[in-house]
Swiss-Prot record:
Keywords: Dioxygenase, Iron, Metal-binding, Oxidoreductase, Vitamin C
Domain called Fe2OG dioxygenase: residue spans: 78-180
Organism: Nitrobacter hamburgensis (strain DSM 10229 / NCIMB 13809 / X14)
Any single biological process term in GO: DNA damage response
Molecular functions (GO terms): 2-oxoglutarate-dependent dioxygenase activity; iron ion binding; L-ascorbic acid binding
PROSITE patterns, alphabetized: FE2OG_OXY
UniProt cross-references to Pfam families, sorted A to Z: 2OG-FeII_Oxy_3, PKHD_C
Residues that hold 2-oxoglutarate according to the record: 171
Cofactor comment text: Binds 1 Fe(2+) ion per subunit.
Requisite cofactors: Fe(2+); L-ascorbate
NCBIfam families associated with the record: PRK05467.1-2, PRK05467.1-3, PRK05467.1-4
Protein name (record): PKHD-type hydroxylase Nham_1514
Amino acid sequence: MLTCVPGVLEKDDVADFRRIMDAAEWEDGRSTAGAQSALVKRNEQLPPDGDLARTLGNRIISALTANPRFISAAIPLQIFPPLFNRYVASDGHHFGVHVDNAVRGDRMTGLRIRTDLSVTLFLSEPDDYDGGDLVVEDNYGSHEVKLPAGDLVLYPASSLHLVTPVTRGTRVASFFWLQSMVRDDHARSMIFDLDTAIQSLVERLGRDDPETVKLTGIYHNLIRYWAEV
């Protein structure tokens, strides 16, 4: 399931992020890549253990925990500290096809997660750069994603994916992973669809409508059946 979540960060927050990040020191993005990914990764990152990345990452996590659509789609158990990258056209940056590591560990906190979902939060407007599309492959084909700044996309971390070469401008984003309470993507997708339908019914019929209450009970029982906490 590939899901877009609009407006995770307000435009003023994005501008503040960019002001801070544009003045920062960046390093070779291959420093956090696995052996296979390092062969096809050409970009830059903020030092992942630096105070700047941690401070900005905490702001993102705060925004995520207040976003109902993100919570509904991801059902997060653990969120890996967000990382930050940029792709600069003049440096020929791109990221060839790869799959993310199944387990990620954070050196500073000792946190280890199973990477159920990969997340990209866009921090550049689509008009600011050419190329730089996130391309995610699944059983239904390839999906090209290029969202407004402040929006994010969630997709299964098991997916093959790539970032096409940036040919003009600079693409800046945050990327990270999370472990969901519901491991199976198909089950998580069904729960998300059910929750979306329930919220629509609540708007039309009210939260105390008997059928809405019944469906809400089914939702929680499915979570209870599948959740690993």
